[in-house]
């Protein structure tokens, strides 16, 4: 399998009108990657909710909307740039651009316009700090991750994970116009959660990534190395997840909930490591442990932030 990235197709290769004429609302929404932004919006709302001072309902809703639109806009730019590799991978071939339901130029303009609007509206409604973090997160995902890291290094997910970790800081900043230990800890949790989450996916989608020339860790370093990295990053994540407890930002509820979730994640990582493998470390069970770990990681992050919200409510 190749460890080099597939070059971007020349402009115009995928410039085709929608199969049934103009793109429908469904196609425009699909460009925003709704499944991805749902978790982003949740963590952003959590960052806002755990702040000492709650925003007014209108400001809170505008903040959540701007995070949603900003994240979706970055996703649209990502789909525009990745249209060549999306057309190769089974998991992404049905996306609007490679499937011929969306002209590529329209997707790019759509992403850029929504990016600018989300930042301007958030700045006008809240403050410059929140808008600046949102703008940087969009730039980080659209340019640094999508246009550089994704196709150039197996550490793409490790570094690129920062893009999806900013929303808690945005939510907090929109409310407080400042930064503190807790939102930074929330950023670190999401940042360190990203590698084991996506590497679990990449284990069972390895052939797809290799076919597209994306240097994901299993493609470049092999499945066995990836399994060890999942375990290592899971241990680091579980340690960092308890930082809010160590600095006395949370109470017993968060500590207990997170400790139980951490134990579950560690067990998942060990199962991935001990999966039945051939001589090259390729799973003989169709990567069932990795598939379970991927699903568990989603539940983990959701319940951890829920535990944080409940804890902050209980301690006032």
From Swiss-Prot:
The keyword Transmembrane applies. Pathway: Porphyrin-containing compound metabolism; heme O biosynthesis; heme O from protoheme: step 1/1. It catalyses: heme b + (2E,6E)-farnesyl diphosphate + H2O = Fe(II)-heme o + diphosphate. This is Protoheme IX farnesyltransferase. Carbon 2 of the heme B porphyrin ring is defined according to the Fischer nomenclature. The chain crosses the membrane at residues 28-48, 57-77, 106-126, 129-149, 156-176, 179-199, 230-250, 254-274, 296-316. It is found in: Cell inner membrane. Its main location: membrane. It comes from the Bacteria. One of its GO terms (biological process) is heme O biosynthetic process. One of its GO terms (cellular component) is plasma membrane. One of its GO terms (molecular function) is protoheme IX farnesyltransferase activity. Keywords: Cell inner membrane, Cell membrane, Heme biosynthesis, Membrane, Transferase, Transmembrane, Transmembrane helix. Belongs to the UbiA prenyltransferase family. Protoheme IX farnesyltransferase subfamily. Converts heme B (protoheme IX) to heme O by substitution of the vinyl group on carbon 2 of heme B porphyrin ring with a hydroxyethyl farnesyl side group. Pfam families: UbiA. It is an enzyme of class 2 (transferase). It is a multi-pass membrane protein. HAMAP family: CyoE_CtaB (MF_00154). Its EC number is 2.5.1.141.
């Amino acid at each position: 399998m190749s460890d080099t990235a597939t070059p971007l197709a020349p402009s115009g290769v995928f410039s085709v009108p929608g199969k049934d004429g103009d793109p429908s609302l469904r196609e425009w929404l699909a460009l925003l990657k709704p499944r991805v932004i749902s978790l982003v919006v949740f963590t952003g709302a959590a960052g806002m909710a755990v702040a000492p001072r709650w925003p007014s309902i209108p400001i809170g809703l505008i903040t959540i909307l701007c995070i949603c639109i900003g994240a979706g806009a970055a996703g649209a730019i990502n789909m525009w740039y990745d249209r060549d590799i999306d057309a190769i991978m089974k998991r992404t071939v049905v996306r609007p651009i490679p499937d011929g339901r969306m002209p590529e130029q329209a997707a790019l303009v759509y992403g850029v316009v929504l990016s600018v609007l989300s930042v301007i509206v958030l700045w006008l409604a809240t403050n410059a700090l929140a808008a600046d973090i949102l703008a940087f997160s969009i730039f980080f995902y659209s340019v640094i991750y999508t246009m550089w890291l994704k196709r150039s290094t197996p550490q793409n997910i490790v570094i690129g994970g920062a893009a999806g970790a900013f929303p808690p800081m945005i939510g907090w900043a929109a409310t407080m116009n400042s930064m503190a230990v807790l939102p930074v800890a929330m950023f670190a949790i999401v940042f360190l959660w990203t590698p084991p989450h996506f590497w679990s996916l990449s284990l069972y989608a390895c052939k797809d990534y290799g076919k597209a020339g994306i240097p994901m860790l299993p493609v470049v370093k092999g499945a066995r190395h990836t399994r060890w990295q999942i375990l290592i990053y899971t241990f680091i994540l579980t340690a960092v997840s308890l930082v809010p407890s160590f600095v006395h930002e949370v109470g017993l509820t968060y500590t207990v909930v997170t400790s139980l979730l951490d134990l579950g994640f560690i067990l998942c990582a060990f199962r991935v490591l001990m999966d039945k493998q051939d001589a090259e470390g390729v799973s003989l069970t169709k990567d069932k442990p990795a598939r379970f770990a991927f699903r568990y990681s989603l539940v983990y992050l959701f319940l951890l932030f829920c535990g944080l919200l409940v804890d902050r409510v209980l301690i006032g």
